[in-house]
Amino acid sequence: MTEDNPQFNQWYEQDTEVDHLLRDAAANDEEQRSELSLRPQFLREYIGQEALKEELNVYISAAKQREEALDHVLLFGPPGLGKTTLAMIIANEMNVNIKTTSGPAIEKPGDLVALLNELEPGDILFIDEIHRIPTNIEEIMYSAMEDYFVDIMVGQGPTARPVHFPLPPFTLIGATTRPGMLSKPLRDRFGIINSLQYYTPEELQQIVVRTADIFNAPIKSEGAYEISLRSRGTPRIANRLLKRVRDFAQVEGKDAIDKNIVTIGLDKLRVDNRGLDETDHKLLETMIEYYKGGPVGLNTIAANIGEESETLEAMVEPYLLQIGFLQRTPRGRVVTEAGYTHLGHAYQRKL
């Protein structure tokens, strides 16, 4: 930390407040906070992402043997796959502290410097939604990541002057659902870049059983598997569906969560046997009914169903692409034959 630097202390007190950066990041995701008790603490407890775990284990072990900070890490993939959890696990495995914030919370250079000032040697700064950091902030990060220092202007007008702030060796972990929005200079400064993949039903079944045990909610194997099939390959969704099914089981007086109560509960929640919800159905049905299955632009689809195009691109479209119900083409999105079949429509091959 640079607390012994009087120039920093004066600027720091006047320009920013680090607590609000950390609070804002936490307050932005109530669901993540509620899931803290469900998160594994170490790699050996983490289910799925086997190749990624093996790589991280090597990098972490090597950094600890050299007594160095871990290289900067970029994690990308759809929401809910465990990027934040992995950041916490890396901190635990390295036995260092972690500061957590989000890209939108870092609004000015002083915000970033304030966060970096909180770090001790080897600590981790985790930035969720790192693709949303402003360009001028991103440029300051270059020297911080490469050479562990930042230069920032202190004061205003004619009295403004550059001040050099040395930083301790640290690890930046960035998480994003949209890696294509990161600039090449920023992306190139991450030494470890990994994508998280959708989970298999078998992996999700293990996660559901583990979560049910934490909830002290008895669950049968076929019940856990049925939840996994409807969870869109995503642990966060699996845990959320389990919570709701647990409510149905309790009200119905069930001793354990079985496949029957899972089916009843999730049918009432309008989550079908492939994990598609109302928004998915509305998107596909609109494309079929009004645009003959496409091709049609994402903005047009969003306007038709009353959703933001950014929401559809980040939250809805990836899974439909993954399971083969939707295709991207140069002319727009197209519903596939599998998508037609799932919705019970006759497919007419386009010439």
From Swiss-Prot:
GO MF term set: ATP binding; ATP hydrolysis activity; four-way junction DNA binding; four-way junction helicase activity
GO cellular component: cytoplasm; Holliday junction resolvase complex
Gene3D superfamilies in the cross-refs: 1.10.8.60, P-loop containing nucleotide triphosphate hydrolases, Winged helix-like DNA-binding domain superfamily/Winged helix DNA-binding domain
Matching SMART domains: AAA
Binding site for ATP: L38, R39, G80, K83, T84, T85, E146, D147, Y148, R189, Y199, R236
Superkingdom of origin: Bacteria
Top EC category: hydrolase
Renumbered residue ranges of the record's region Large ATPase domain (RuvB-L): 4-199
Enzymatic reactions: ATP + H2O = ADP + phosphate + H(+)
Binding site for Mg(2+): T84
Keyword set, alphabetical order: ATP-binding, Cytoplasm, DNA damage, DNA recombination, DNA repair, DNA-binding, Hydrolase, Nucleotide-binding
Pfam families xref list: AAA_lid_4, RuvB_C, RuvB_N
GO biological process annotation, one example: DNA recombination
Its EC number(s): 3.6.4.-
InterPro entries associated with the record: AAA+_ATPase, AAA_lid_4, DNA_helicase_Holl-junc_RuvB, P-loop_NTPase, RuvB-like_N, RuvB_C, WH-like_DNA-bd_sf, WH_DNA-bd_sf
Location(s), subcellular: Cytoplasm
Described purpose of this protein according to its UniProt entry: The RuvA-RuvB-RuvC complex processes Holliday junction (HJ) DNA during genetic recombination and DNA repair, while the RuvA-RuvB complex plays an important role in the rescue of blocked DNA replication forks via replication fork reversal (RFR). RuvA specifically binds to HJ cruciform DNA, conferring on it an open structure. The RuvB hexamer acts as an ATP-dependent pump, pulling dsDNA into and through the RuvAB complex. RuvB forms 2 homohexamers on either side of HJ DNA bound by 1 or 2 RuvA tetramers; 4 subunits per hexamer contact DNA at a time.
Family: Belongs to the RuvB family.
Quaternary structure and interacting proteins, as annotated: Homohexamer. Forms an RuvA(8)-RuvB(12)-Holliday junction (HJ) complex. HJ DNA is sandwiched between 2 RuvA tetramers; dsDNA enters through RuvA and exits via RuvB. An RuvB hexamer assembles on each DNA strand where it exits the tetramer. Each RuvB hexamer is contacted by two RuvA subunits (via domain III) on 2 adjacent RuvB subunits; this complex drives branch migration. In the full resolvosome a probable DNA-RuvA(4)-RuvB(12)-RuvC(2) complex forms which resolves the HJ.
Record's comment describing the protein's domains: Has 3 domains, the large (RuvB-L) and small ATPase (RuvB-S) domains and the C-terminal head (RuvB-H) domain. The head domain binds DNA, while the ATPase domains jointly bind ATP, ADP or are empty depending on the state of the subunit in the translocation cycle. During a single DNA translocation step the structure of each domain remains the same, but their relative positions change.
NCBIfam families to which the protein is assigned, alphabetical: PRK00080.1 (NF000868), ruvB (TIGR00635)
Record protein name field: Holliday junction branch migration complex subunit RuvB
Organism field: Leuconostoc mesenteroides subsp. mesenteroides (strain ATCC 8293 / DSM 20343 / BCRC 11652 / CCM 1803 / JCM 6124 / NCDO 523 / NBRC 100496 / NCIMB 8023 / NCTC 12954 / NRRL B-1118 / 37Y)
Gene that this sequence comes from: ruvB
